[in-house]
């Protein structure tokens, strides 16, 4: 193996890595292009409404938008905290609101 062969094989590896990265970027761009622009704002507003009633973290909510040929689906998943005594939780929320 000569010195030229070493540099030649490195170039093809670099090109394939660059091509793979570009394909990933294009796939992400296509995925986000089909999402409605209001989705982040909708997620934030839903989170505010949910927090009025239940204390949840930001990462406890996920919004998924899917688009087929003839329908659009908005899926909302919320991981609610375990509550041992719901009455105490309601009382705590009332105290916090005052």
From Swiss-Prot:
A biological process term (GO) from this entry: regulation of division septum assembly
Entries under InterPro entries matching the protein: MinE, MinE_sf
Function: Prevents the cell division inhibition by proteins MinC and MinD at internal division sites while permitting inhibition at polar sites. This ensures cell division at the proper site by restricting the formation of a division septum at the midpoint of the long axis of the cell.
SUPFAM superfamilies: Cell division protein MinE topological specificity domain (SSF55229)
UniProt name for this protein: Cell division topological specificity factor
Highest taxon of the lineage: Bacteria
Family to which this protein belongs: Belongs to the MinE family.
Keywords: Cell cycle, Cell division
Record gene name: minE
Keyword hit for Glycoprotein: no
A Pfam family per the record: MinE
Gene3D superfamilies linked: Cell division topological specificity factor MinE (3.30.1070.10)
HAMAP family tied to this protein: MinE
């Amino acid at each position: 193996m000569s010195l030229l062969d070493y540099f030649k094989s490195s170039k093809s590896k670099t090109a394939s890595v660059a091509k793979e990265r570009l394909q990933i970027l294009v796939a992400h761009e296509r995925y986000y292009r089909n999402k409605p622009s209001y989705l982040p704002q909708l997620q934030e507003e839903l989170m505010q409404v949910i927090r009025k009633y239940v204390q949840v973290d930001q990462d406890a909510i996920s919004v998924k938008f899917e688009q087929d040929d003839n329908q659009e689906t908005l899926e909302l998943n919320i991981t609610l905290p375990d509550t041992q005594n719901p009455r105490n939780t309601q009382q705590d929320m009332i105290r916090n609101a005052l």
